[in-house]
Amino acid sequence: MSTEASTGETPEFQSYDHRGSPTQEAMKREIQSLIQNLVKLSRTAPAIHVLIPPEIVMYVEGSRNPDIYNREFVETVQRMNQMLKGRSEALQALQAQIAHQLQIAIPEMKDDIERAVEATGGKVPITGITLDP
């Protein structure tokens, strides 16, 4: 049962004036503006030199997100830094152990050993303290 039959009222219609011609003109202006901007961009692009790593270009060409590449790169660098830090700390501990053992074995060279270790950025352990091997 319709509303107009039960209430006795006639339905109201809203009408919109379709302005085809102005809409087409606006679209034409937008397309022309877009084309002009693309022409400007293509003319200025050769003058701008941006070095993009080929790996990122390959990611984009393979429809992959370059942010993923950046995240993976940062994670790899962090792992390598941790590994190198561990190696550096191990070498410092080895240097300290060798310096300590040399000071015990050749006490008359204590000053020379300390200078050599300190010159390379290391710290000489105090004589008399045993270090864990």
Curated annotation (Swiss-Prot):
<feature type="compositionally biased region" description="Polar residues">
    <location>
        <begin position="1"/>
        <end position="13"/>
    </location>
</feature>
<keyword id="KW-0805">Transcription regulation</keyword>
<keyword id="KW-0010">Activator</keyword>
<dbReference type="GO" id="GO:0003712">
    <property type="term" value="F:transcription coregulator activity"/>
</dbReference>
<dbReference type="GO" id="GO:0006357">
    <property type="term" value="P:regulation of transcription by RNA polymerase II"/>
</dbReference>
<feature type="region of interest" description="Disordered">
    <location>
        <begin position="1"/>
        <end position="28"/>
    </location>
</feature>
<comment type="subunit">
    <text>Component of the Mediator complex.</text>
</comment>
<comment type="similarity">
    <text>Belongs to the Mediator complex subunit 10 family.</text>
</comment>
<dbReference type="GO" id="GO:0016592">
    <property type="term" value="C:mediator complex"/>
</dbReference>
<dbReference type="Pfam" id="PF09748">
    <property type="entry name" value="Med10"/>
</dbReference>
<dbReference type="InterPro" id="IPR019145">
    <property type="entry name" value="Mediator_Med10"/>
</dbReference>
<feature type="compositionally biased region" description="Basic and acidic residues">
    <location>
        <begin position="15"/>
        <end position="28"/>
    </location>
</feature>
<keyword id="KW-0539">Nucleus</keyword>
<protein>
    <recommendedName>
        <fullName>Mediator of RNA polymerase II transcription subunit 10</fullName>
    </recommendedName>
</protein>
<comment type="function">
    <text>Component of the Mediator complex, a coactivator involved in the regulated transcription of nearly all RNA polymerase II-dependent genes. Mediator functions as a bridge to convey information from gene-specific regulatory proteins to the basal RNA polymerase II transcription machinery. Mediator is recruited to promoters by direct interactions with regulatory proteins and serves as a scaffold for the assembly of a functional preinitiation complex with RNA polymerase II and the general transcription factors.</text>
</comment>
<keyword id="KW-0804">Transcription</keyword>
